[in-house]
Swiss-Prot record:
<dbReference type="GO" id="GO:0016787">
    <property type="term" value="F:hydrolase activity"/>
</dbReference>
<comment type="subunit">
    <text>Homodimer or homotrimer.</text>
</comment>
<dbReference type="GO" id="GO:0000287">
    <property type="term" value="F:magnesium ion binding"/>
</dbReference>
<dbReference type="InterPro" id="IPR015813">
    <property type="entry name" value="Pyrv/PenolPyrv_kinase-like_dom"/>
</dbReference>
<feature type="binding site">
    <location>
        <position position="70"/>
    </location>
    <ligand>
        <name>substrate</name>
    </ligand>
</feature>
<feature type="binding site">
    <location>
        <position position="148"/>
    </location>
    <ligand>
        <name>Mg(2+)</name>
    </ligand>
</feature>
<dbReference type="InterPro" id="IPR005000">
    <property type="entry name" value="Aldolase/citrate-lyase_domain"/>
</dbReference>
<comment type="similarity">
    <text>Belongs to the HpcH/HpaI aldolase family.</text>
</comment>
<dbReference type="InterPro" id="IPR011206">
    <property type="entry name" value="Citrate_lyase_beta/mcl1/mcl2"/>
</dbReference>
<feature type="binding site">
    <location>
        <position position="122"/>
    </location>
    <ligand>
        <name>substrate</name>
    </ligand>
</feature>
<dbReference type="Pfam" id="PF03328">
    <property type="entry name" value="HpcH_HpaI"/>
</dbReference>
<keyword id="KW-0378">Hydrolase</keyword>
<keyword id="KW-0460">Magnesium</keyword>
<dbReference type="GO" id="GO:0006107">
    <property type="term" value="P:oxaloacetate metabolic process"/>
</dbReference>
<dbReference type="InterPro" id="IPR040442">
    <property type="entry name" value="Pyrv_kinase-like_dom_sf"/>
</dbReference>
<feature type="binding site">
    <location>
        <position position="122"/>
    </location>
    <ligand>
        <name>Mg(2+)</name>
    </ligand>
</feature>
<protein>
    <recommendedName>
        <fullName>(3S)-malyl-CoA thioesterase</fullName>
        <ecNumber>3.1.2.30</ecNumber>
    </recommendedName>
</protein>
Length: 285
């Protein structure tokens, strides 16, 4: 897992055309916000949304929430103008839709020389080219677009997301190999807390840093599931203490709760504590 100074447990989509939603987002408990100019905005509102969002980012206070702008694709009539408008905006990253190959990032990189780039991974071709995409020097994060991927695959929804597993796994491997942040796709039934929790647990078990969300009601569950639990923090501290004690006696392994603890487990334990500290710092900011 990449070390992160900022948590990405909850990444909330906000339509760039909705002034009330943009205002409300300033007080929500989201680690990051995706200000959406693409799927969430009707064609006849695209220009209005671009102007509204640019003004909002210049004047509104989103605190320490990570601000990501999802632009329209370069193959649309709005994509280039979006990039030109937000190249120097008060944002933390630009999210590019439907990235299928590393070349899709090149034109964007030239137009946005200073901001980190994130990629929407939502096409079958993108899954197959995940390693190539993740290796791009300007890329900082990946966002799984599971709705579009399901459409391409022609798959039916299953709670275990069986049809998604190969693509999710390829992107996770690529992201981890290149030290990128990677967040899971959305859960559409925003009133189904049990289903959301189960899918968040699955995503965390797989190794995602957090989950993209479509409704503020989903924030609490995502934040809880993707945070280290008190038990995990306590275990990490005990593992580190036991391993350091073993090292003082010239031993390379320790035993905690009847299980062998080696250096690789200590790396994970320290990452757990670092994530807990980052979350605590974010809450205090």
């Amino acid at each position: 897992m990449a070390h992160q100074a900022h948590p990405f447990r909850s990444v909330l989509y906000i339509p760039g055309s909705k002034e009330r939603a943009l205002e409300k987002a300033q007080g929500l408990a989201a680690d990051a916000i995706i200000f959406d100019l693409e799927d969430a905005v009707a064609h006849d509102e695209k220009i209005h949304a671009r102007r509204l969002l640019k003004t909002t980012l210049e004047t509104a206070d989103y605190g320490h929430r990570f601000r990501i702008v999802r632009v329209n694709g370069m193959d649309t009539e709005w994509g280039r103008a979006d990039l030109e408008a937000f190249a120097e905006a008060k944002a933390d990253a630009i999210l590019i839709p439907k990235v299928s190959r590393a070349a899709d990032l090149e034109a964007v990189a030239a137009l946005v020389p200073d901001l980190p780039l994130w990629a929407m991974m939502e096409t079958a071709q993108g899954m197959l080219n995940a390693a190539e995409i993740a290796a791009h020097p300007r890329l900082s994060g990946m966002v799984m677009g599971t709705n579009d991927l399901a459409k391409e695959l022609g798959s039916r929804y299953r709670p275990d997301r069986l049809a998604m597993q190969a693509g999710l796994g390829l992107c996770l491997l690529a992201a981890r190999a290149h030290g990128l942040t990677i967040v899971d796709g959305v859960y559409n039934a925003f009133k189904d807390e049990e289903g959301l929790r189960a899918e968040c647990e699955q995503g965390r078990d797989m190794g995602f840093d957090g989950k993209t969300l479509i409704h503020p009601a989903q924030l609490e569950i995502a934040n809880a599931v993707f945070s280290p639990s008190p038990a995990e923090i306590e275990l990490a501290n005990r593992q580190i203490a036991a391993f350091e004690e073993a090292e003082r006696h010239g031993q390379g392994v320790a035993v905690v709760d009847g299980k062998i603890v080696e250096n690789l487990h200590i790396v994970t334990a320290r990452q757990t504590l670092a994530k807990a500290e980052a979350i605590a710092a974010f809450r205090a900011s």
